[in-house]
Amino acid sequence: MTDDNPAIVIDNGSGMCKAGFAGDDAPRAVFPTVVGRPKRETVLVGSTHKEEYIGDEALAKRGVLKLSYPIEHGQIKDWDMMEKVWHHCYFNELRAQPSDHAVLLTEAPKNPKANREKICQIMFETFAVPAFYVQVQAVLALYSSGRTTGIVIDTGDGVTHTVPVYEGYSLPHAVLRSEIAGKELTDFCQINLQENGASFTTSAEFEIVRDIKEKLCFVALDYESVLAASMESANYTKTYELPDGVVITVNQARFKTPELLFRPELNNSDMDGIHQLCYKTIQKCDIDIRSELYSNVVLSGGSSMFAGLPERLEKELLDLIPAGKRVRISSPEDRKYSAWVGGSVLGSLATFESMWVSSQEYQENGASIANRKCM
């Protein structure tokens, strides 16, 4: 793609959509992956009537809208709504004509082939893009860290994956997933805050809980000792001012919330913690590459942003693996945008030109071309 018409990169997340132009350092648009439709025809009289509200606008009007999230646990579930998100992305956020730009989209690991073909079909037939590519989010996150081999722990809003990548290719047989991710953590934070006397029940208040989670929570290196210390002193207590001016104190919820990533049983789940997922994924890989994977553990996604997470993960992995093995955790500062940044790098490479699925190839081969060319 030329500098005048750089490729557009869209990272489709369960919680947030990130979009921008290949070659840029960061996405230009970041907005919630949510579509709202008026509950009743008469509710929004006096305002400019719209059939749908998308992203932040939908959340701002959530009281009179029925919200739908087209991506659940990493998979597109509502294609009509997803089209509307992409339309909003092109015309409202980026103000770009789809027909002028190739598009590189991200997908979750093990995305069904039919889903990939559907994305390809929509991009060529609805948006008339000149060229298309789709790549696994974790692979792009690894690229953004300057690596082509490693294991990515990608934990976003809807799903967590451990994805081994060897020389640029993901190894699907070893990919593991957990539904313990951002939304689950926010739910768990809400439970912990309620136990402390704070009540959050509406969807608007859920957003407040999410903000508390993101601003105040941290991962304890030694959970039991921090739990004991929090009962003896106020060292772990922080205050948070609610929108109405009321100030609440937040204590154990600060470290109990992200502890769920390591101990899902705290919320009655029998899923593995992220350290166990990482270990099991590497054990599924060829013995000859395991040491290299342990030396290149890359964190990615918004739910990996907790302070203390890299240190705790290293400690837990060292307890699981044979003595003498080395573990190295990479936690880039911009890791909540890692997949998008990797797509930006890939989409701007001259050597990538031959990888795009062109509109001519689509016309000749149909949507199945996406599964042959997008590896």
UniProtKB/Swiss-Prot annotation:
UniProt keyword terms in alphabetical order: ATP-binding, Cytoplasm, Cytoskeleton, Hydrolase, Nucleotide-binding
Entry's EC annotation: 3.6.4.-
GO terms for cellular component: cytoplasm; cytoskeleton
Gene3D superfamilies noted in UniProt: 3.30.420.40, Actin, Chain A, domain 4
Cleavable signal peptide: none
Domain of life where this protein originates: Eukaryota
InterPro entries: Actin, Actin/actin-like_CS, Actin_CS, ATPase_NBD
Reactions catalysed, as given in the entry: ATP + H2O = ADP + phosphate + H(+)
An example molecular function term from Gene Ontology annotations: ATP binding
UniProt cross-references to Pfam families, sorted A to Z: Actin
Transmembrane segments: none
Subcellular location: Cytoplasm, Cytoskeleton
Family: Belongs to the actin family.
Function: Actins are highly conserved proteins that are involved in various types of cell motility and are ubiquitously expressed in all eukaryotic cells.
Protein name: Actin
Species whose genome carries this gene: Giardia intestinalis
